[in-house]
Regions:
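Glycine-rich, acidic/polar active-site loops that bind/position phosphate-bearing ligands
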Residues: 1-103
Length: 103
C-alpha cells in the first residue's frame, strides 16, 4: 500500500514568537483575532513563497535528501504564513517513518 503524507506548519518570525507567551508555553495560539475579511487567494494559497521561507525550505529539503527522504512539493497553504511540504509516496511503513522524521 502506497501512502503520501504531508506536513503543514506556520512560519513565525522569531521576534514575534518571543513576544507571544501562548506560543512559547503552549506551542499553539491561544489568543488571537478573527481572520481578515476578503483575503485574496493570491496572497496566500496561490501566492509566491517569501524568499526567507524558500531559503529555509531549501535547507530542510537538502537535509532530508541527505538522510534519504525525497521531498516532493512545497507550497503556501490557506492561512497567512502557513506552508506545506510533502514527501514522495512510498510503502506505508516507510512513508510513516519518513513523516515522523520530518516532524
Amino acid at each position: 500500500m502506497l501512502l503520501g503524507l504531508e506536513q503543514e506548519f506556520f512560519v513565525i518570525p522569531k521576534e514575534i514568537y518571543e513576544k507571544r507567551e501562548d506560543l512559547k508555553f503552549a506551542g499553539r495560539t491561544l489568543v488571537g483575532s478573527p481572520p481578515p475579511r476578503n483575503q485574496q487567494l493570491g496572497e496566500h494559497y496561490y501566492g509566491r513563497i517569501p524568499t526567507i521561507v524558500e531559503k529555509v525550505l531549501s535547507e530542510v529539503e537538502s537535509e532530508l535528501l541527505q538522510i534519504g527522504i525525497p521531498f516532493k512539493t512545497r507550497h503556501n497553504e490557506v492561512a497567512v504564513n502557513q506552508f506545506e511540504v510533502a514527501c514522495i509516496c512510498d510503502e506505508a511503513g516507510v512513508a510513516i517513518d519518513q513523516n515522523m522524521i520530518m516532524m
